[in-house]
Swiss-Prot record:
PROSITE patterns: RIBOSOMAL_L19E. GO terms for cellular component: cytosolic large ribosomal subunit. The lineage of its organism: Archaea, Methanobacteriati, Methanobacteriota, Stenosarchaea group, Halobacteria. Residues 74-85 have a biased composition (Basic residues). Residues 45-94 are annotated as: Disordered. InterPro entries: 60S_ribosomal_eL19_sf, Ribosomal_eL19, Ribosomal_eL19_arc, Ribosomal_eL19_CS, Ribosomal_eL19_dom, Ribosomal_eL19_dom1, Ribosomal_eL19_dom2, Ribosomal_eL19_dom3. This is Large ribosomal subunit protein eL19.
Amino acid sequence: MSDLSAQKRLAADVLDVGENRVWFDPDAQSEIADAITREDIRELVADGTIDAEDTQGNSRGRARERDAKESYGHKKGAGSRKGKAGARQNEKREYVAGIRAQRQQLRELRDDGTLSPAQYREMYNMANGGEFDSVRRLTNYVEENYGDS
């Protein structure tokens, strides 16, 4: 096997890649050894005898494994947390999601006749004031106070 370092250097320049990314066809060593000009190298590139290998990317295998574990609640303990609680879960978004769900539930109860418009307005204002932590608490309150009517 002959020394092809000069050809590798020329090929790297022609292909505009680093020398480590230059690939030579193992079956065409003698043909490559005869190529001594840039034009010769360009012809071999056109033939497919010399090519540039793809760049090495970062493997996402470990990231996928970690994401899978986090999706079912692992790796989320106190030692893994860096931001404050409000940075990890936005308090405003949490509030907005909760109040929208409660208001939707109140609308449904009003529309199906469980609540009168006056009761609906009273409950709406209570929800707005933070009286209910969740839709479940709101539903329990309705059942306890307005369930008979």
